[in-house]
Amino acid sequence: MTKETQLQVEAIKNGSVIDHIPANVGIKVLKLFKLHKTNQRVTIGLNLPSSAMGAKDLIKIENVYVSEEQANQLALYAPHATVNQIENYDVAKKLTLELPKKINAIFECPNSNCITHNEPVDSSFTVINKNDDIQLKCKYCEKVFSREIVTERN
């Protein structure tokens, strides 16, 4: 007899699990945290069935713990994702995602005339959240962009 509730993605002993990522966003999260360049084992589930979301992505990273700062950056891509820190196969800590007030050196400014493209300065955005409409305002050119425009380019 086979078990009907078998895990589709293997459990990890120690590390981080990022769950409830909207489908087709998991690859962007990998790049955000530069997980495609790590030596640790990363397990990715794409378009997994989800009763709440229809389909979701999932990322498990062994021996790497997502920080609260990283979890807050994740909120730009997946505001309802969950981040669990795993120790000895058990959830040791659940991180709450909150949108950061500022984001530095993560995204490029979409404005091709912005000085961040030609000067040796890190990009810097202020996060604006009005009625769940998330926008990013560039510190240098002061232009405001939708979250989708900024995150799609990176």
From Swiss-Prot:
Cofactor: Zn(2+)
Gene from which this protein is expressed: pyrI
Protein name: Aspartate carbamoyltransferase regulatory chain
Gene Ontology biological process terms from the UniProt entry: 'de novo' pyrimidine nucleobase biosynthetic process; pyrimidine nucleotide biosynthetic process
Gene Ontology CC annotation, any one: aspartate carbamoyltransferase complex
Family annotation (InterPro entries): Asp_carbamoyltransf_reg_N, Asp_carbamoylTrfase_reg, Asp_carbamoyltrfase_reg_C, Asp_carbatrfase_reg_C_sf, Asp_carbatrfase_reg_N_sf
Role description: Involved in allosteric regulation of aspartate carbamoyltransferase.
HAMAP family membership: Asp_carb_tr_reg
Family indicated by similarity: Belongs to the PyrI family.
Protein source organism: Photobacterium profundum (strain SS9)
Pfam families with a match to the protein in the record: PyrI, PyrI_C
Gene3D superfamilies: Aspartate carbamoyltransferase regulatory subunit, C-terminal domain, Aspartate carbamoyltransferase regulatory subunit, N-terminal domain
Cofactor-binding details, from the entry: Binds 1 zinc ion per subunit.
Subunit note: Contains catalytic and regulatory chains.
One annotated GO molecular function: metal ion binding
Keyword annotations from UniProtKB, A to Z: Metal-binding, Pyrimidine biosynthesis, Zinc
Residues the entry annotates as binding Zn(2+): 109, 114, 138, 141
